[in-house]
């Protein structure tokens, strides 16, 4: 009989953790393991990418209410969930007052503890060989899954968020293993939880170069038809004749569009990704003499803030929010430079995907940047403050020789790592 694995995650919206989960599912061999996937709420663009051999467990209503609006929770009669979430919010309010902070990161710890008291077990008739909690809070897999071994994942830089270590340590410590996605993520995590050192196992985000390249070919992106108006409007009047040369206008316009550099960023619209700084950075780049448009794919709570910053900077023609895209890879393929302007990261999935598509990558110097980018070799690291970030980006935009050097390097290196799945197999031998 094959070993049986359960993996739990909130939903399958477009995000780094969710994309890396798809990579893991695609890498796992159905001839070696049986896989059950428990998605709290069956929503998100990536649901359709779950391989057919993965058994997606039915939704459990109480778990589906984990992140739904409180009015919806009440309307659907989940009173125990409602009270658990209210209690978590009250505990969080008291915690913030005591710590004198406004950082809401610790809320997941309170939500996990309170909701775990009221939700039912997950597929209780089965004892799994391995249970994987892919996103915090990890309480649900700890308390409501029967398994011989359990492992939970770290996806971010824990020194950049507020952590209630006293509350969270017992949860992390209850697992057999704690999976970290990079050495730098391990280092920052152990600064908060040094006693967990023996439990750490490093498993990078699993990504397939073949999959990314295949998806990038699904359609062509026509930038001339995408938002933001035009930087230059041209009018010609005359008879449609050979003398007027109007038949060459499409070619001439294509040359004008090519002169404008297309920057792209992908990710959730949240404080960590720093997209609220993009309009000011863009303004500074344009003032330096570069003609650019910066496109952003994603969604999230900071969208209104980003749009406000775009208006304040007068960058409506140059910073274009594209929203959610179920397949962002053709956009990566079609851009000139991929930019990750984050305040902090674990190990960016989209940076590696851009490298797989041989795109020059620029990242800000967040603490874990050097674990992913060899500065000047397979990408460029620029300062995080807006002024120097813009300066570094502008210099790179103008340095086509350096861009080409990086592209050539990327073409000769494979950034896929499906072999990482062997580390998961080793846990169930």
Give the location of each predicted region.
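Acidic anion/phosphate-binding donor-loop and adjacent secondary structure
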Residues: 162-164, 190, 206-230, 241-244
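Short acidic/histidine- and often glycine-rich active-site loop of Leloir-type glycosyltransferases
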Residues: 353, 366-376, 380-381
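Nucleotide-activated donor-binding/catalytic signature segment of Leloir-type glycosyltransferases, i.e.
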Residues: 56-57, 258-260, 307-323
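Conserved acidic donor-binding segment of nucleotide-sugar-dependent glycosyltransferases
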Residues: 375-376, 380-387, 395-400
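A short, well-ordered alpha-helix in the C-terminal region of glycosyltransferases
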Residues: 402-417, 423
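Short hydrophobic beta-strand element within catalytic cores of glycosyltransferases
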Residues: 360-364
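Aromatic "clamp/platform" in nucleotide-sugar-dependent glycosyltransferases that forms part
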Residues: 324, 343
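Donor nucleotide-sugar binding/catalytic pocket of nucleotide-sugar-dependent glycosyltransferases
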Residues: 149-155, 159, 174-217
